[in-house]
């Protein structure tokens, strides 16, 4: 990816026991890092360690939505920043940030809670809102989920190439303006198409690997390493 890369920290669903819940780190060529979601618990710390990422490298994170397998690991990322005293920016919509703030204030030690707003800053985003992490520029968008308020995002790198993360649900045509012509497209897939009767992804607002494979060329996404 021409110095830009993705580190997958987990690919599992909410009930996964043999792998970690879906989350990843996005790296720019300049060395900036954005953590996207954090799974459902303190396993995120082990996943970062296994990937060779120090917790102190995580200064920015984006949370797509408030489901437990995406949100609760963020509590541990916040706690590490408060305990070891380094800055952290958390970007998301109002519901996620309200839950994060409330949970942290209820369960973290008071001496750490006192540093909220100083070391850890919650940044509220609206549909179409923008932010920057180092040399990467981001725009978030509402994926129009029918079950939970959720944001995806586009990331534009310093070389002009663009990545689109569709969030934790299948591509919605209402988001086409963001996904169209993205060089890299991150599309969820609950299971293979052959296993659809076994795992029933459609009942859970998910899709299969076949859908991801079909949507990618339709949206003119390359999904290849940049040489």
Please place each PLM-identified region on the residue numbering.
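Active-site-proximal loop/helix segment associated with metal-binding centers of metalloenzymes
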Residues: 16-18, 124-193
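Active-site metal-binding motif and surrounding structural segment of the metallo-beta-lactamase
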Residues: 42-91
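Conserved beta-strand hairpin/beta-sheet module of binuclear metal-dependent hydrolase folds
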Residues: 2-50, 150-168, 184
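Active-site neighborhood of phospho(di)ester-bond hydrolases with catalytic His/Asp-centered motifs
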Residues: 35-39, 59-69, 93, 163-169, ...
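A short helix->loop->beta-strand "cap" motif at the edges of active sites that frequently abuts
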Residues: 32, 84-88, 215-221
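Short Pro/Gly-enriched beta-strand edge/turn motifs at strand-loop
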Residues: 2-11, 106, 133-138
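Active-site neighborhood of divalent metal-dependent phosphoester bond hydrolases
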Residues: 84-88, 96-122
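Cap/insert and terminal regions of metallo-dependent hydrolase folds
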Residues: 170-227
């Amino acid at each position: 990816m021409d110095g830009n890369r993705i580190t997958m920290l987990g690919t599992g669903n909410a009930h996964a026991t043999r792998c970690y819940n879906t989350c990843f780190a996005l790296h720019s060529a300049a060395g900036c890092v954005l953590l996207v979601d954090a799974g459902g618990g303190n396993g995120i710390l082990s996943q970062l360690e296994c990937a060779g990422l120090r917790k102190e490298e995580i200064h920015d994170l984006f949370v797509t939505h408030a489901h437990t397998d995406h949100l609760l690991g963020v509590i541990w990322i916040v706690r590490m920043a408060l305990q070891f005293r380094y800055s952290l920016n958390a970007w998301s919509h109002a519901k996620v940030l309200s839950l994060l703030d409330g949970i942290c204030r209820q369960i973290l030690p008071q001496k750490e809670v006192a540093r909220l707003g100083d070391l850890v800053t919650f940044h509220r985003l609206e549909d179409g809102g923008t932010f920057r992490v180092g040399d990467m520029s981001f725009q978030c968008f509402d994926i129009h989920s029918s079950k939970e308020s959720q944001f995806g995002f586009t990331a534009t790198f310093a070389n002009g190439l663009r990545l689109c993360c569709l969030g934790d649900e299948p591509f919605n045509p209402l988001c086409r303006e963001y996904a169209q012509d993205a060089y890299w497209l991150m599309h969820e897939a609950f299971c293979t198409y052959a296993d659809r009767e076994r795992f029933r992804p459609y009942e859970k607002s998910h899709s299969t690997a076949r859908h991801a494979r079909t949507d990618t060329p339709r949206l003119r996404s390359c999904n290849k390493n940049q040489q």
